[in-house]
Amino acid sequence: MSYNPYRSRNYGGGYSNNGYRQRHYYSDYNESSYNSSYRDQYDRNGSYSGSKGRHYNSGTSRNAPPPSSSAYSSDSSSRTYANSSSSGPAKIPVGPKSLTIDGSTNGDLPTAGTQKHNIPPTNAISGTDATTGVNPNDSNFTQLLLHQDLSKQIEFSGEIDSKRNYKVIYDPELDKSLSKAERKTKQKKIRFNGESLSSHDVTDPRKSSTGSTSAYFLKPNKKSKKFPFKQLPQPKFIYDKDSLGPPPQNEIVVWDLPSTTSEVYLSNFFKSYGDSIKDLKFINDPLNAVPLGIATCKFQGNPDKSMRIAKKFIANVRINHTKIDGAELKIALNDNDNKLLDDKIKVAQDKLRISRIKIEEEEKKRLKKQQAIEDQKRRETEKAAKEKKLQESANSSHESRFKPNTTTLSIRHHNEVIPGVFLPRELRKYIRDRPYIFINDKYVPTRKVSSQDIKKVLNKYDWTRVLPDRSGFFVVFNSIKECERCFINEDGRKFFEYKMFMELALPENFNESSSSTSNNDNTDLSASNRKQNDVVEEASNMLIKEFQNFLAKDIRERVIAPVVLDLLSHDKYPKLVEELKAKELATKKAASPIVTNAVRQVKSKPNVLSSLAIKSKPQAILPSFRKKKDLPNAGLNSANKAKKNVIPMQHALNYDHESDESDEDDSTRSTTPLTPTLKRERSPTVSSVSNDNDIEDKLEDIQKPSKKKQKKTKLHQSFLYDSASDEDMEAVSEEKEVEKDESEGEEDIDYSHIDKIYQPTEDYPRPVYEEVPRFPSDPLDLDALQSIIKDDEDITLLQTALADVTSESNIKNMEYWAWKQKDIKAKAGVQEISEDLEVIGPLDSRFDSKSGAFKSEGYRKIPDADKIEYLPHRRKIHKPIKTIQHDDDELNANNSTTNNNSNNIQSSRVNRANNRRFAADISAQKQMLGSETDILNLNALTKRKKPVSFARSAIHNWGLYALEPIAAKEMIIEYVGESIRQQVAEHRERSYLKTGIGSSYLFRIDENTVVDATKKGGIARFINHCCNPSCTAKIIKVEGKKRIVIYALRDIEANEELTYDYKFEKETNDAERIRCLCGAPGCKGYLN
């Protein structure tokens, strides 16, 4: 079968009689229809024409008629589409021939000029009119679908109503999710005539998927296989030298900047966004160079890139509402004509001009107001001058009216002036020739009215005193003017149920001129101001007196005393010094026979037994020439009192001056006299001799006077600051000299035939063998018996004690048994380990060596928890923390009871008062110098700190201890160190952790400041951590600077360790946690 090269499709179907097949498609839209016809031309006899053509014809109306016919022609070079209407036959040129649609053919195509005459008006064969296209014979043929009017509605032959167009919305046969049985139960969903659709729902299908045409320019998504424009690239034009027009604008304009904004600050702000800028300029007023708050800048790079960066920067600033110095940043891109910049400059200049005009107006107002004030003052001055003249004239009249020793009667008596005054004798010492007002008792009775009531009534007047008397009230004034004013205004005034009639009296010795001149300046002052001036004057007088005392003291100590001491120097009076020394030598020689006789009587005893016998007899007390205090063995009745701290006058001022410059810890701390302990006690004979001070002194003077004098000088120089220790060391040296002298004067006795351990001693009786202390838990074995029994006397005593004891064991060979017992003990490895008289128990099993020898296991770090078990200063962790201890606690207790230093300990309030005086002295010295210097800078915290010291701690390494009791809430010490920034502190912390130092000495003050006491700091850095601390840290301001100060949380005893809670942040990693060693009852176990 051959195909026709031309095929036409019509919806509704139908074949034409000339071999065409046509179908027409109609849509069911109301507003528009899509009408297309696809036509392929095939040769009727089965031959293929070699070409295929398609013709698209669309109409906007559903009722538009389809094309009647179409023709297609082709040649080797082109394709031509032709449409023929029903009005006449259409001709298609094919080679030399021509083809007509109605079937007629001609041999040759007619020319344009002959076509009209060659075509007949009516076709002879078909009978069709060539002009109208109407064939009267059409009615004789059968009407096919091809010959129907396709513009009319097609009638359907199915079940559905043919009058309604429809669309299948849902077809169960096409639903793959349903089974065959379910498909039979479902029905089709059909929509008729586009129901439920409105006009606005009809959209262009090309825009329905994305909503814009941008999808046609971008890459298609994975779901779509459509390539509308095959990814056409967007055009980008780069500005270069050949480009036309202005370049892309990349200049930024910033306006309304605060006046405090600097160019460097703004440049750094722009750089913080990561883009480098150039050509940053601040625009100033050209007239007076005042900043207008406008700046311009450009970004670096080519014009296109810099424009993109500028637009991005402006968008970020507007989104984030960026502020500079509290003002929101206003920014925009300048145009090519600088129109934006010129507008902003003009607005800024207008604002500046308006502000300048406003300032000028305010200045004019201020000058006008000032001029008015000056005019007012001038008028007041003139008025005061006039009043002064009038007052002077009035004073002249007063002089004639008010005279001494006169009395002006009350208004009741018409103010009559009479000579003489009434003044009781006992009140004269209070009034002292001053004017006064007398209120008689018959007008205001003193029994019913008190002086306080009179004071309240006359409160507005500057009276001095109100003196009650049985005759009446006397109101005393310092000024005659004030007295007259009170008399004129208050005379005859009603006072309760009485009338207050007054009499103004002037004493006989009253001097009006002195009184008026002394009170002219204070006339305008009120009574409250006068009282305030009195308080200030009194305080000034007190300060002046104190300053005078200090000045006199300084002159006495720094000027007069050195001159007097120089005048009294021994070098200026050599003859007098020699005479005094000769008198002392003569006195010592006169007393020497008595001393030698006494010594010989004492030293005549040959051995220890005789000395023991003498001990039981009462000793004769020899006469004393000079008594010396505070010897160690001065008797039971005498207490160990410290010698008074006496320093020679010629050195007193020097040491007083040096003590001010010494460490303040020593100044605030009470001094305890050093009491040296002798290694062995002296014998009763020697002690009895030493009890008498006179014998000892005379022995030293007679035997070795020069040596004694030399030793005193050396000791005095070395212990000049502690006279008690000076005297004690002097006493020790004197005792040693006495012992040496006695040993030299004693008779020589030969003890060579006696064993050394049995030879007699001269100091005190002692056992032959040293006693070994024993404990109840010690086993009494063979070694213990051998250590107890030393000689034949001990064995004899032991045999006597064990005579009644019978042994039940049968030991044949005693030596073998003894050797066996010792061997068993040695093999068992039982060893007695003692330290500080305390037996240490066996070690824990975790300390056992795994390899059998600790040397083979190498070195390892011992944890702090294990160090507590064997280190002496760590073992005190469970005892009251008192690490600072003296060599002899009992001796210190005795010294504390005998030497009462309570007078030397000052309270905190007194210390602060002394520190304030010292600070005032420093400020006065700085004012005298007249220049600022760091030498006299005073840190008030160093004067308020408590005496503390550092020592080995029971908690960890070193600790800080209190040297005296500290009350709660008192300041202890300042945490001193190097003040650094936060960034530097982080860097140092990392370096400290790498080197193993740790970061426990870094103390934060605020967000930006940290105090580092690792390498530069005070002793406060030794304070240890404790979960139950005794101190706390506070940050205070001293002279405008922040300081870290340690305060006491509770009462702290002397020698108690100071602790503080470090407050580390808790670590989640167990490997980084630090174990706490404080040992407090509420210990948390870890620092962090």
UniProtKB/Swiss-Prot annotation:
GO biological process: methylation
Skewed-composition ranges (Low complexity): 1-10, 27-38, 69-87, 510-529
Biased composition regions of type Basic residues, renumbered to the chain: 705-715
Residue ranges annotated as motif RxxxRR motif: 912-917
GO molecular function: histone H3K4 trimethyltransferase activity; RNA binding
Annotated ranges, domain SET: 946-1063
Pfam families with a match to the protein in the record: N-SET (PF11764), SET (PF00856), SET1_RBD (PF21569), SET_assoc (PF11767)
Keywords tagged on the record: Chromatin regulator, Chromosome, Methyltransferase, Nucleus, S-adenosyl-L-methionine, Transferase
Binding-site positions, S-adenosyl-L-methionine: Y1062
Domain statement: The RxxxRR motif forms an adapter helix that bridges the nucleosome and ubiquitin.
Role of this protein: Catalytic component of the COMPASS (Set1C) complex that specifically mono-, di- and trimethylates histone H3 to form H3K4me1/2/3. Binds RNAs which might negatively affect its histone methyltransferase activity. COMPASS recognizes ubiquitinated H2B on one face of the nucleosome which stimulates the methylation of H3 on the opposing face.
Listed name of the protein: Histone-lysine N-methyltransferase, H3 lysine-4 specific
Organism: Debaryomyces hansenii (strain ATCC 36239 / CBS 767 / BCRC 21394 / JCM 1990 / NBRC 0083 / IGC 2968) (Yeast)
